[in-house]
């Protein structure tokens, strides 16, 4: 049984978010939650929220036992980028690219 949860358009860059996702892939959910709770990264808060949602989905929709769940898959895809302008000296302007991510967490009982 596999249950997934998604957070789309998360306001963090995929590169930074993948650093956190790689740490919890394949771990039991209790250990993964522990790692995410004490991680100092902003992306850890976002991934933890998605993992909590996936656990709740498994428990409510599938009747799964939380103690047996493992983080099956975690992947972070690139979302749309927002392009902004930053005024600079002498009438010039720089482009600022604000990246977004689509975070997907799949928990399974095997």
Curated annotation (Swiss-Prot):
It comes from the Bacteria. Pfam families: Ribosomal_L22. This protein binds specifically to 23S rRNA; its binding is stimulated by other ribosomal proteins, e.g. L4, L17, and L20. It is important during the early stages of 50S assembly. It makes multiple contacts with different domains of the 23S rRNA in the assembled 50S subunit and ribosome. GO terms for biological process: translation. GO terms for cellular component: cytosolic large ribosomal subunit. Keywords: Ribonucleoprotein, Ribosomal protein, RNA-binding, rRNA-binding. Belongs to the universal ribosomal protein uL22 family. The keyword Mitochondrion does not apply. This is Large ribosomal subunit protein uL22. GO terms for molecular function: rRNA binding; structural constituent of ribosome. Gene3D superfamilies: Ribosomal protein L22/L17 (3.90.470.10). Part of the 50S ribosomal subunit.
